[in-house]
């Protein structure tokens, strides 16, 4: 017996109509602020382009310069072969970065995925650096090198996370670690081949300078092919946005489709890096803003995100041209980061519903260890042994020697300051990493990842530039202020979202990118003071003195003595704000106190060993993976692991290329990153 479908009466129709209209109005209101922002950016880009073109060439000559420039008029030649290609390349690269960002985020279901956070861009840059160092000619050679570097890094990162079904926490951790590793190799090559790679400073920050149309002619067919392949993968990628089981039930060969889409995104990323260098942030920001504008469907995001990326890079480059005329030449990637970081921080509180998989999903660690004291004693003995070996065992002109007696006394004034400096820096960074991870409840948080080390380093470098003469007395306050300001901005930006890991990482990466770009701008400026700073930024203990070590030790002892007093806070805060309030904890004062403590630890360590140490991320994870999750055991084992790691890194740095030295901060990345990747891979099985 057939049943007639009941139709809603007039009142019900009216209610449904009102509900639909209310949802429509709500969508308009949610997208109003980003739309107004885009409109303002578009107007600013058009106005700056008009101003820059008018200064470069009288408007009466624009038509001739565009179609058939007079070779006898230099201004027309510059307009045709430099400014117009630069405008075109900015639009192409911006659109390409927006497209790549959507591809990565859709396939991985991860709002933090983009070429820089996954390490793909850094791998491509490293490949190009190697070809530049070996002076291998040819445009195809650099393209092949960029593709090779990006593919190797991509295979490593995705291979680590594949066993955990591309878990967001594992994927981003692996990407950040491999990116730091490639960056350390790059920095090492620059230190030993500074003159040959001087031009890489400006290029590596992203520069759109063009001398002809060859770059545009080479890039646009490649991007067009990428767009066509993306459209062919539209249905599989739409299904990839669903649960894996649902996608398989709908007939999708999930692994094959995911591999194809990721390969396309990696290839496009490498081609973009080869064209203009690393321009971060756009691949992260453009898809995010497209989603905030209401583009929920994949096809809508694929159309809107490239337009947003092109607009942002267009505006950034026009600002560069204006700054070059009124101040000095800076890289486009630097301005992109400086524009994008405040915009992202402004938009973060407006992300009402930021959907992402659980950051702690399928996160397995070892069972909680007992007999903590025995492990702590063993770790302390290992640290003392590493220190004694670093003091006594080494190389000279005749080979390997074990120093003792008179020889050891002669070597001691040269060795003990740098070894103790490395040890203390490792301990402080490890403890700071533990505090930050517990304060934020985020396993990916650390001084390096959240940009706190970069903020401290920027504060120190800025003080060196602003204060004449001997400014040592101001370095610790400047570094502490930079670190505290960075962490405070991150917590304010992410606080309205309940300190979710996604918001914390977005804010941290925005600030980290901005500080890193500012430091690279100072390096590329040619200022003679930056030659001294470069070694410190790479994490060298070469200039450590007895007086500096003594002062650092006093500060470290005072700061570490405060940590046990905060044990209750550090135990409760990872449970969330509601749990903390339920047990009567004053949430804001405790967070501010822990914020200040972590900032001072980070600043003191950064002054000693620079911002590239990596220990603050790795040491807490090593302790946690070994089974130490309670507050004080976690702190103690992390501190011991950080101290051992940096002492060993400093010794290897002195011995590996004797008589030349590799900075301990860089070498700690070489030592720590492979082991950390191994632990991540082991967890995924």
UniProtKB/Swiss-Prot annotation:
InterPro entries for the chain: ABC_BtuC-like, ABC_transptr_permease_BtuC
Superkingdom assignment: Bacteria
UniProt key word Iron: yes
Keyword Ion transport: yes
Cellular component aspect of the GO annotation: plasma membrane
Principal location class: membrane
GO biological process per UniProt: siderophore-dependent iron import into cell
Pfam families from the UniProt entry: FecCD (PF01032)
Keywords linked to the UniProt accession: Cell inner membrane, Cell membrane, Ion transport, Iron, Iron transport, Membrane, Transmembrane, Transmembrane helix, Transport
Membrane topology per record: Multi-pass membrane protein
Transmembrane segments: 35-55, 87-107, 120-140, 143-163, 172-192, 222-242, 265-285, 302-322, 328-348, 373-393, 416-436, 456-476, 479-499, 504-524, 553-573, 592-612, 632-652, 660-680
Subcellular location: Cell inner membrane
GO MF annotation: an example: transmembrane transporter activity
Gene3D superfamilies: ABC transporter involved in vitamin B12 uptake, BtuC
Subunit comment: The complex is composed of two ATP-binding proteins (FhuC), a transmembrane protein (FhuB) and a solute-binding protein (FhuD).
Entries under NCBIfam families matching the protein: PRK10577.1-1 (NF007865), PRK10577.1-2 (NF007866), PRK10577.1-5 (NF007868)
Function recorded in the entry: Part of the ABC transporter complex FhuCDB involved in iron(3+)-hydroxamate import. Responsible for the translocation of the substrate across the membrane. Involved in ferrioxamine-mediated iron(III) utilization.
Family listed: Belongs to the binding-protein-dependent transport system permease family. FecCD subfamily.
Protein name, UniProt field: Iron(3+)-hydroxamate import system permease protein FhuB
Protein species of origin: Salmonella typhimurium (strain LT2 / SGSC1412 / ATCC 700720)
Organism lineage string: Bacteria, Pseudomonadati, Pseudomonadota, Gammaproteobacteria, Enterobacterales
């Amino acid at each position: 017996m057939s049943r007639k479908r009941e139709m809603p009466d007039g009142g019900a129709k009216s209610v449904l109509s009102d509900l639909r209209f209310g949802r429509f109005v709500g969508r308009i209101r949610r997208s109003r602020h980003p739309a107004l922002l885009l409109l303002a950016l578009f107007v600013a880009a058009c106005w700056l382009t008009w101003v820059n073109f008018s200064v470069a060439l009288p408007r009466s000559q624009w038509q001739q310069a565009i179609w058939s420039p007079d070779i006898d008029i230099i201004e027309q030649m510059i307009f045709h072969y430099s400014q117009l290609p630069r405008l075109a390349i900015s639009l192409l690269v911006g659109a390409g970065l927006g497209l790549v960002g959507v591809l990565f985020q859709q396939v991985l279901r991860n709002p933090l995925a983009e070429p820089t956070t996954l390490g793909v861009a850094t791998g491509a840059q490293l490949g190009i650096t190697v070809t530049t160092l070996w002076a291998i000619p040819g445009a195809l050679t650099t393209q092949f090198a960029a593709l090779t570097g990006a593919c190797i890094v991509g295979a490593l990162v995705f291979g680590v996370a594949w066993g955990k079904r591309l878990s967001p926490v594992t994927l981003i951790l692996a990407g950040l670690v491999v990116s730091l590793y490639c960056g350390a190799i790059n920095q090492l090559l620059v230190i030993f081949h500074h003159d040959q790679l001087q031009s890489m400073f400006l290029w590596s920050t992203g520069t759109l300078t063009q001398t002809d149309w060859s770059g545009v002619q080479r890039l646009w067919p490649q991007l067009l092919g990428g767009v066509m392949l993306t459209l062919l993968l539209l249905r599989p990628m739409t299904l990839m946005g669903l649960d894996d089981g649902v996608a398989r039930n709908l007939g999708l060969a999930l692994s094959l489709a995911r591999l194809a889409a990721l390969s396309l995104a990696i290839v496009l990323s490498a081609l973009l890096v080869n064209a203009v260098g690393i321009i971060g942030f756009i691949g992260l920001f453009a898809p995010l803003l497209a989603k905030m504008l209401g583009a929920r469907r994949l096809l809508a995001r694929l159309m809107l995100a490239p337009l947003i990326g092109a607009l942002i890079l267009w505006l950034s480059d026009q600002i560069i041209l204006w700054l070059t005329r009124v101040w000095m030449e800076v890289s486009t990637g630097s301005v992109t980061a400086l524009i994008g970081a405040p915009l992202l921080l402004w938009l973060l509180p407006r992300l009402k519903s930021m959907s992402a998989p659980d950051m702690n999903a399928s996160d397995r660690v070892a069972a909680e260890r007992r007999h903590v004291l025995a492990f702590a004693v063993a770790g302390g003995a290992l640290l003392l042994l590493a220190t004694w070996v670093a003091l006594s065992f080494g190389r000279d002109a005749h080979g390997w020697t074990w120093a003792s007696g008179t020889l050891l006394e002669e070597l001691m004034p040269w060795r003990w300051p740098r070894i103790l400096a490395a040890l203390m820096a490792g301990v402080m960074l490890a403890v700071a990493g533990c505090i930050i991870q517990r304060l934020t409840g985020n396993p990916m948080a650390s001084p390096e990842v959240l940009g706190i080390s970069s903020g401290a380093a920027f504060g120190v470098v800025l003080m060196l530039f602003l204060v004449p003469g001997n400014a040592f007395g101001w370095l610790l306050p400047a570094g502490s202020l930079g670190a505290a300001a960075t962490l405070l901005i991150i917590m304010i930006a992410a606080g309205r979202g309940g300190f979710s890991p996604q918001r914390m990482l977005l804010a941290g990466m925005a600030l980290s990118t901005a500080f890193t770009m500012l430091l690279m701008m100072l390096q590329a400026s040619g200022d003679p003071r930056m030659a001294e700073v470069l070694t410190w930024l790479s994490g060298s203990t070469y200039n450590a003195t007895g007086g500096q070590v003594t002062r650092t030790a006093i500060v470290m002892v005072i700061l570490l003595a405060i940590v046990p007093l905060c044990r209750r806070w550090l135990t409760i805060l990872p449970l969330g704000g509601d749990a903390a309030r339920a047990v009567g904890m004053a949430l804001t004062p405790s967070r501010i106190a822990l914020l200040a403590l972590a900032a001072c630890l980070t600043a003191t360590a950064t002054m000693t060993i620079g911002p590239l140490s990596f220990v603050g991320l790795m040491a807490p994870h090593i302790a946690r993976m070994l089974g130490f999750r309670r507050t004080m055991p976690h702190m103690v084992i992390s501190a011991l692991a950080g101290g051992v790691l940096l002492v060993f890194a400093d010794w290897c740095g002195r011995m590996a290329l004797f008589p030349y030295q590799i900075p301990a901060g860089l070498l700690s990345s070489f030592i720590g990153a492979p082991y950390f990747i191994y632990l991540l891979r082991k967890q995924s099985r």
